[in-house]
Amino acid sequence: MLAVVAALMAFPSAIVAGLLIGRYPHSRIGKAINTLGVVAMTLPEFVIATILWLVFSIWIPIFPGVTVVPSNATVLELLPHIWMPALTLAAVVFAHSMRTMKAGVTTIQTMPFVESARLRGTKERVTLLRHILPAAMPPVVNTIAVDAAWLLTGTFVTEAVFNYRGLGRLAIDAISDRDTAIILPIILFGLGVYLTMSLIADMVVRLLDPRLKQQRS
């Protein structure tokens, strides 16, 4: 559930932000978001988690800083405790996807087919959504696939900071106890997740990339 919430928070907003920043790089909002993205990429995960914990649990006590619900808690009981770790993970993957999208838009918008659409009098919004966005998406899809796999398998630092009982904490406890009956399935699950995400990304890229569409036709 933590990975799903973080993905829903990060990926749609990263695509929109990267699209707008790439198209309007000199706007104040664009510069501010881009700066935040750079900071999020350079800071270690535990530092982001600590900053969010200080801000939203100590200075502005909106969310609980530590997960203290039982293992059989319902979704409604877990929701107040999931926002902080989800926001931490979302900040990390948002930065990756946003900057990949920005780089793609910056490159694509100067290409001849985009200039041709503008010369035909196509509205800028239509050009952005119909021509620039699909062409800029393939690298973003690959980035999202890697980040989504990481969200499912590599969140033990955030889970440790917020005492969230997830797959990462389970793996750490199993390694500490040398419990191979748990370690091996977790390793196989991680490998399966990365392979599955890679295959899904490859299929989505083939559907989105205009050059591959032309080759198939």
What name fits each language-model region?
Residues 35-66, 88-95, 99:
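Membrane-water interface segments at the C-terminal ends of transmembrane alpha-helices
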Residues 1-29, 45, 73-217:
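Alpha-helical transmembrane segments of integral membrane proteins
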Residues 51, 67-68, 119, 217:
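Short capping/connector residues at structural and topological boundaries
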Residues 12, 55-68, 159-165:
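Peri-membrane helix termini and adjoining interfacial loops of integral membrane proteins
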